[in-house]
């Protein structure tokens, strides 16, 4: 059985598509998967900055500040916030040494 079920033929009225076995479950499943793939790809292209920024930085809490003095913790928070405020278009990663 071939997955290529559509044949275009030239008629007097123009190009027509003659589909055979269009009720085949395999064809229906492949069509649904193809449509879902297209929708997900479009959403990915539209929202990739938001999605990847959220995955990369939103789910991480950053390095542990346990045992560090409160002044260093506050300084780290301010640096993180200023990096986000200054450059909202590009990803910014600040690592303290």
UniProtKB/Swiss-Prot annotation:
Protein name: Matrix protein 2
Sequence similarity: Belongs to the influenza viruses matrix protein M2 family.
Record text on subunit structure and interactions: Homotetramer; composed of two disulfide-linked dimers held together by non-covalent interactions. May interact with matrix protein 1.
Modified residues (Phosphoserine): 64, 82
Gene3D superfamilies: 6.10.250.1640
Pfam families xref list: Flu_M2
Residues covered by region (Disordered): 60-83
GO MF annotations in UniProt: monoatomic ion channel activity; proton transmembrane transporter activity
Annotated site location: Essential for channel activity, possibly by being protonated during channel activation, and by forming the channel gate and the selective filter: 37
Species for this entry: Influenza A virus (strain A/Chicken/Pennsylvania/1370/1983 H5N2)
Sites marked Seems to be involved in pH gating: 41
Protein origin, superkingdom: Viruses
HAMAP family: INFV_M2
Function: Forms a proton-selective ion channel that is necessary for the efficient release of the viral genome during virus entry. After attaching to the cell surface, the virion enters the cell by endocytosis. Acidification of the endosome triggers M2 ion channel activity.
Compartments where found: Virion membrane; Host apical cell membrane
Membrane topology: Single-pass type III membrane protein
């Amino acid at each position: 059985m071939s997955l290529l079920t559509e044949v275009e033929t030239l008629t007097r009225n123009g190009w027509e598509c003659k589909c055979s076995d269009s009720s085949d479950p395999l064809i229906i499943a492949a069509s649904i998967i193809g449509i879902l793939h297209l929708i997900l790809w479009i959403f990915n292209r539209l929202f990739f900055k938001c999605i990847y920024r959220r995955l990369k930085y939103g789910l991480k809490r950053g390095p542990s500040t346990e045992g560090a003095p409160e002044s260093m913790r506050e300084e780290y928070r301010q640096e993180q916030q200023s990096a986000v405020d200054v450059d909202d278009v590009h990803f910014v990663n600040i690592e303290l040494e």
